[in-house]
Amino acid sequence: MHSKPETIANVSVKEYSFSKKQIQGVVKASQFRWTFIWSFHKGLLTVNPPLGRALIEDALLRFLLKKDYELEAGNEYKFTISAKF
């Protein structure tokens, strides 16, 4: 039986600002690295650079929607993506 492909994404929260209503951070998966801004009051996620963004954007958004109230600046988090890249 084959195991499902997966990749571990590592999220580092750099800033969590209630006044700006946003979270800024870095997410790394495989050889890729992106910065992100999650404007939680607008439901808007910005991920840069665009290279490989399609690989991470939906999974990162699901993670942030599920965990945003638990996240703290300066902490590291992990989540699993059901794809290998």
What is each residue range found by the language model?
Residues 1-6, 82-85:
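Short intrinsically disordered terminal tails
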Residues 23-29, 45-47, 83:
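Generic recognition of long tandem-repeat/solenoid scaffolds
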Residues 48-85:
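Mixed-charge, Lys/Arg-enriched low-complexity segments
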